[in-house]
Amino acid sequence: MSGDPSVVGIVGEWLDGAGIKRSDTATGKVNVRLVERIDQAVVNQEEAYNLTVSQEEISIEAVTEKGVYWAVQTLRQLTDRSTREVRIPCCEIIDWPAFGIRGFMHDTGRSYISLEEIKREIEILSLYKINTFHWHLTENQAWRLESKIYPQLTSPENMTRYPGCCYTQEQVREFLDFCRKHHILVIPEIDMPGHSAAFTRTFGCDMQSPKGKGIIKELLAEACDLFAEEPYFHIGTDEVHFTDPDFVPEMVALVRSKGKKAISWSPGCEYAPGEIDIAQLWSYMGKPKPGIPSIDSRFRYANH
């Protein structure tokens, strides 16, 4: 096997898992190469790849490590191990995604799901080139993300469903490492100021009160630091009556001060271009707005 040292390990892991032995004297070759661009890919060059399988060679060309990873996922799908021999059909595949974010969400605020289960799902979904996990961490029922500043948030008495079940910061860091290995972007979400009964039970105040706003700013800053390498943070803002017109702008400013882009549900808080970075459409009432990038998730959610 030859190629760029930064990416040959991805292919080597697949070879080992497929039971394909590596040898310097083997007649079949595997070549991995990073290139400036994949000419046929009209969008999302960073995920594009050119995979060629012949009788003599497996060749992968990609612009980034992520493109190599998706090429290997395609090889996993092509590999036939139904007999004692490992078979891969000869082919040439030039592939790139139409959409930069291809994701799934778990509402673990309502219903706790173990990280072991989520990891299994990520391993499966990454085979199909799903590249984003939206992690809804807080709800009326529970606050699932450990806080070192306010540990009482995850106390069993402040949860009405799956009491005591939460994700520690150490677990989150390990999980993020796992996601990076599978080239999964994680979008964490703390829903605010609505869907926050767990917050109110804990502190005896609403997020939009002066006391509550001070607390949620500390929590949001702590969470942004925990998810330091993730480029986005979701702040919710749906299904709530706003009593403090400065609440959302201040939260967006805090997220941006941490070097991240802020995402908000739509319908939710109303924004003009520049006031939010991405709107995530969640129902038929959510409409794309000129000047505001959007993620289209309409008609794809089931509250549970």
Where are these regions (language model features)?
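Contiguous, structured surface segment used for ligand recognition
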Residues: 1-99
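Conserved beta-strand edge residues that scaffold enzyme active sites
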Residues: 29, 139-140, 192-194, 269, ...
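Catalytic-core regions of glycoside hydrolase
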Residues: 64, 237-304
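Short helix/loop capping segments that flank catalytic or ligand/cofactor-binding pockets
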Residues: 68-71, 114, 304
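Short, solvent-exposed loop/turn segments at the edges of secondary structure
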Residues: 46, 55, 99, 148, ...
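Substrate-binding cleft of carbohydrate-active enzyme catalytic domains
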Residues: 99-258
